[in-house]
Amino acid sequence: MEPNIPSPVCRKDGVEIHAAAPEGSAEAFSVIAVRENGAWLLVRHSARKTWELPGGHREPDETPLEAACRELYEETGALRFRLCACGCYSVTQGGQTSWGALFLAEAITRGSLPESEIAQVRAFAALPGALTYPTIQPALHACAEKHLRRGALENAPLFRVPVRKEERP
């Protein structure tokens, strides 16, 4: 392990979950494990037949939190939600390491799905077998479940769309 990379708090199938990203690294992605009425919300991209946790690339002017709020709305239609950070994750493939931020959310109010690349939002009791990223998503989901069991959402801040910089906790 490189000296400036924090020790992972969880490791599974090439995915490492860290408390923080190493100095000088930026989380390029925000992924959100979302609960609604006791189930997990997953999304299906219009070009795929598989399911995934909501999330996506961070815009250049966004924080990981702002990206998570935007992606949560764009991909699930969530208008009001509780949201907390679970940590950062790294994925190394082909010698390249990319970093992302993992969040846990509880959707309180959802509206219509905005026009986007998402074809379907569906509630699952557990992760389905047909995942878009089968080596990454289970590790992220396991970490989010651990945070959920520890009560992470109980005192998590309440957000509403749109989230602006002045609303960040």
Spell out what each predicted region is.
Residues 1-31:
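Acidic, metal-coordinating catalytic segment for phosphate/diphosphate chemistry
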Residues 34-37, 105-107:
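Active-site beta-strand termini and strand-to-loop segments that position acidic
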Residues 35-74:
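Conserved Nudix-box catalytic region and its N-terminal flanking loop in Nudix hydrolases
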Residues 58-81, 89-142, 168:
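Unchanged
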Residues 131-169:
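Charged phosphate-binding loop/patch that engages nucleotide di/tri-phosphates or the phosphate backbone
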